[in-house]
């Protein structure tokens, strides 16, 4: 392991900060929502091959409403929250970031909340529930939901979307 003292300091520092949940403040959520709304969804649609591509835009916003997702079991795999709560596994994960094993090497002072979330999700033997990509959902709405158009005689449709998130 990279200098054990360094790992202990980083471990203790992150424990003091708390679990690296996504932000929940209104300004952050509004900024991310605006990025999602302004994303060029047509770039995801391949009509010839009938494929809707993927983009991570808006996933962080969706996860910000579901902090409980970090502790939901997927089969027999560990949850990211179990890694966070286990001193040995959390220290091993931090070591992988500090040493550049599996993750991009970073000095302790440059480890971000995003790095921590990534490590907790990808730690060996761990799985996190997945979420439907908001951009893919929006692209499907663009294709299948009528728009208000006096010219075409259509009225804006209503969407009932049971895939709108993990929920509680």
Description of each model-found segment:
Residues 137-168:
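Conserved S-adenosyl-L-methionine
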Residues 124-131, 137, 153:
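Long amphipathic N-terminal alpha/beta scaffold segment
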Residues 1-129:
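N-terminal accessory regions of S-adenosyl-L-methionine
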